[in-house]
Amino acid sequence: MMKKLVALLAILLSFAMIATACGSDDDDSSSSSSSESSSSAAEETEEAEEAPAEEEAEEAEEAPAEEEAEEEAEPEPEPVEERTASEIGVTADTISIAVIVADLQGLIDIGYPLPAALSTDHLSERITKYFDIWNAAGGINGRTVEGVQITWNPLDPSTMENACIEATLDNEVFMAVNASGFNQTFIPCFTEDNDTTFFYGEVAPQLMIDAAPDRLFSLNPPSEVAGEAGAELIVAQGIIPEGSKVGILSSNNPAIGAAGDAATAVLEAAGYTTTTIEVNTLSGDNAAANAEGGAAVSQFTAEGVDHVFVILPFIYAAGFWGEVGALSPSWERTILDSASSNCTPFGASRTDPAANNAICVTSYDSYASNDGGVDEDDAFEAECRQQFVDFFPIFEGQSNRGVASGEVGLETADGELLNSDYPPGECTMAYLMEIALTNAGVNPTRDSFAAAMKEISGPQAFRSNGEGAFGPDKNYYSTQMQAVRFQVTPNDTSRGADGSFDGCPAPTNCWIPVTGEWFAID
């Protein structure tokens, strides 16, 4: 019995051990599976955590590279050009410009009537006051513009050459400017002999422009253009009957004589015959030149002319007009605008009444309307007039249309006091110079100034129907011309209901449009 019990216990113990062994294998398998699962999950988690980290790391590495690429792609700022002494008359801080004006004492000494305000300094300040405005605003591209007053005696041509030497050699200016009066004969001293830019407010001959195309600029058309266009306009409007004989009162000054030559060619091509009398205006002897002009009246009459073209400046034409008044010849007269101030309000105020009804072909405007009344300023002209009265307190804030330059308190028959008209040429020239100097670059040269000038078009005061334009091959600013008639108006004339003084804007001689039509200069 006992043996059976022992055997039974042995069997039970064996089963227990087998069961324990089996349980241990299952646990190991489960533990291994769980461990593998946990390991896989951990690896996936690590991969999931590592992926963004790697992407962030890659992005962090790529971002500076991209920023560097972007920085490399952006254009670098232009280096600031330093101002240098880029040309004669230009330093790092200044530009020197010669303002060439007449020493009016010479005219006063011979008894030529000049208004009290019209002084030598006044003439130069019409330009230099604009320099003051530019300088107060910071200058031209940071440079101060310095005006150098240079004078000449209008009755002594040799002093004009001295003015050139003083400007170009003694002062070594960047450029020279003259609004009116300088004898064209001496312009090549600046432009050709000394390679200096010369800006002229009147008529520069084409032959001189061709000799120095990047140094000579003007407001008015060249003598050749004025003579040709003037003669063509006279012919086209039938002012001179076909087949007439035309006299040409010219000058031995080549710059003025070129207009006579051009007019002669047009007239002869149109079937007219011509005869020319040349006055010596280069001697500096005003009395002798006027005597020659006076003698020409009888000579033209003797040669049987029907019409005379007058090309002389008014300062040398007084003898001619005086003799016309004395002899009252039957032939008509036309003035060509090829000389200083011929067809300006100032010129009209100083021209002999014997020139009454003479025709002038000019690029200058006229305040008088051929329909009566007085024209108003356009916007640019109004600005010029305001600047003028601001510059010169002597005029007490008042400037009147058509009143001769420099007049102060000109009393009318009605007791009204009138003051000088503003100088339109100087205003236009200052406007153009400021643009060209600015556009010539931080370090301007005479060549860059010329290139800048030739690109300008815009307003023009009291000329060319209010507009102007230079061009690649056009060194004069005016683009249009018109025919005007000389009107004699005594200073005791009262202002009419239309605001004019017998057709003139002031009680003084003036120019009145013949038709009011402007003609483009080809």
Question: Which residues does each predicted region cover?
Answer:
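Solvent-exposed, acidic/polar segments of extracytosolic/periplasmic ligand-binding ectodomains
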Residues: P75-T84, I88, N356, S457-D522
